[in-house]
Amino acid sequence: VTSHRERNDRKAPFRGAHPGGPRGGNFRGAKTASSDPSGWIWGWHAVEAALTNPDRAAPAKVLATAERAERLKALHPRLPLEILENGEIARRLPPGAAHQGVAVQTPALDGVALEALADPAEGFLLMLDQVTDPQNVGAIFRSAAAFGARGVILQDRHAPQLGGALAKAAAGAIESVPAARVVNLARALDKLADLGWTIVGLAGESDTPLETALDGRPAVLVMGSEGEGLRRLIGEHCDILAHIPMPGGFESLNVAAAAAIALYEASRRVGARVTGERG
C-alpha cells in the first residue's frame, strides 16, 4: 500500500484552493436554497422515489392535492393521505418550496458506512468538500445517478441534509445513489487510498486535463465548494489535481455543472455502476 507521504511526493505542490484559474475556470454557486430540518420531501419525482425506496421507514405524513392523491392511491393503495389545497400544502413547507401538489414527511436516510461504499475499489466515487448549497448538491446527485457513480461522500457537518430542496433538485436520485457521511474528509481520503482508490482533485490551476488524470483505475473525484474550491489540506491528500478544459474561453461553471462533466468523463474512463445497483 502506498503511503500518503509517497503519494504526495508524486504530484506538484497544491498551489491554491480555488478551482478557478486560467484553465479550470470558476465554479460559481447559487444562492442558498430552502432546506427543511423536519423531514419533508416535496415534488412528484422526489416523493415517488422516497415512497418506493425499501430502505426508508414508513412516512409520518403524506400531503397531496386531490389530483395527486388519485395518482398516489393508484400506485400505493394503502398509503394514508391528507388531501389539501395547494396553498395549504405550501403553508406546511419552507417558503418557496415548489411542491407540485405533493409532500411527504419521512425520517432521513441513514446513509452507508465509508467502507461499505468503497470496498472493494471499483468504478468511481464523488466526494464533496464543503459544497453546501442544497440545489447544487441535489443536481450533483442527479448527475451521479445518470453517469453511474458508485456513491457520494459528504462531510458530516458542512453538507445539507438529504431532503427538502436537495431532494427536489435530485428528482429522486438520493434514493438510488448511496451516500456516506464522514467527520473528517482528509482521514477518509487516506482510508480510500489504502483501499486502492486514486484520488483526483478538481482544481483550475492544475496543468493536467481530467481525461489524463483518469487512467482507468478506480477513482475518487473530489470537488471543492462553490466559492472557495478545494481546501488546502484536501488538495494535499489528492494523488493528482486536474482541470476541466474549457476551449470556449468562458471559464465559469456552476459546481453542479462542473461535477456533471467530471462524472461523465469518469464514466468513460473508469466505468459506471450498473443501473439499479446500490452500494
Describe each region flagged by the PLM:
Residues 200-250, 254-256:
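Active-site/ligand-binding-proximal alpha/beta "capping" segment
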